[in-house]
């Protein structure tokens, strides 16, 4: 197998291990989306299987002696010479170096956004827990107990009352 074909097969194999198919399937809502998703997965598996089997194998060496017996040796020698002179060009990747810095910068930005999102999620979860706690105790809670948890609100109400601005 040529170096480029083997590299493609290796990349596809690694990609198949890192794809969270079950996680993506859980996100789908409609039946049509599930059908399309299963078609995508089946197509990916077929292509990946082909890459792993068909393109990852080395070609069998040609038995030139066998052909010399059945065909004239001169013709076989010319074919062998032509076969040996064939050079398969190596793929030189010119695109990846161009986009790698941009991709790395996006990864850094992604990590920062992820951290920010996790902090915001944590804050919101705490806020939800507080609201749930208050909603459970609301029917039996006194104003003093509520103001104990929220002193800034008590100060605001006291200022309004002091200024004869009763809730307006």
From Swiss-Prot:
Which positions form S-S bridges?
Answer: none
Name the Gene3D superfamilies on file.
Answer: 6.10.280.70
Q: Which domain of life is it from?
A: Eukaryota
Q: Specify whether Hydrolase is a keyword of the entry.
A: yes
> What Pfam family is a match, any one?
Mt_ATP-synt_D
A GO molecular function held by the record: copper ion binding
Its annotated compartments are:
Mitochondrion; Mitochondrion inner membrane
One Gene Ontology CC term in the entry: plant-type vacuole
- GO:BP terms for this protein? proton motive force-driven ATP synthesis
| Keywords recorded for this protein, A-Z | CF(0), Hydrogen ion transport, Hydrolase, Ion transport, Membrane, Mitochondrion, Mitochondrion inner membrane, Transport
Keyword Mitochondrion set for record: yes
* Subunit record text: F-type ATPases have 2 components, CF(1) - the catalytic core - and CF(0) - the membrane proton channel. CF(0) seems to have nine subunits: a, b, c, d, e, f, g, F6 and 8 (or A6L).
Purpose: Mitochondrial membrane ATP synthase (F(1)F(0) ATP synthase or Complex V) produces ATP from ADP in the presence of a proton gradient across the membrane which is generated by electron transport complexes of the respiratory chain. F-type ATPases consist of two structural domains, F(1) - containing the extramembraneous catalytic core, and F(0) - containing the membrane proton channel, linked together by a central stalk and a peripheral stalk. During catalysis, ATP synthesis in the catalytic domain of F(1) is coupled via a rotary mechanism of the central stalk subunits to proton translocation.
**Per its UniProt record, what PANTHER family does this chain match?**
ATP SYNTHASE SUBUNIT D, MITOCHONDRIAL
**What name goes with this protein?**
ATP synthase subunit d, mitochondrial
Native organism: Arabidopsis thaliana
């Amino acid at each position: 197998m040529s170096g480029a074909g083997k590299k493609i097969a290796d990349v596809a194999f690694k990609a198949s291990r890192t794809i969270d198919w079950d996680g993506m399937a859980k996100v789908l809502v409609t039946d049509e989306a599930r059908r399309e998703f299963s078609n995508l997965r089946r197509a990916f598996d077929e292509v990946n299987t082909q890459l792993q089997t068909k393109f990852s194998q080395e070609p069998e060496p040609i038995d030139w002696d066998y052909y010399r017996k059945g065909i004239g040796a001169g013709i076989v020698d010319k074919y062998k010479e032509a076969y040996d002179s064939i050079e398969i060009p190596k793929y030189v990747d010119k695109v990846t170096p161009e986009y790698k810095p941009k991709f790395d910068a996006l990864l850094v930005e992604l990590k920062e956004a992820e951290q920010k999102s996790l902090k915001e999620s944590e804050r919101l979860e705490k806020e939800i827990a507080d609201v749930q706690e208050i909603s459970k105790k609301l029917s039996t809670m006194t104003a003093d107990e509520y103001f104990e948890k929220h002193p800034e609100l008590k100060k605001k109400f006291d200022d309004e009352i002091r200024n004869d601005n009763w809730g307006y």
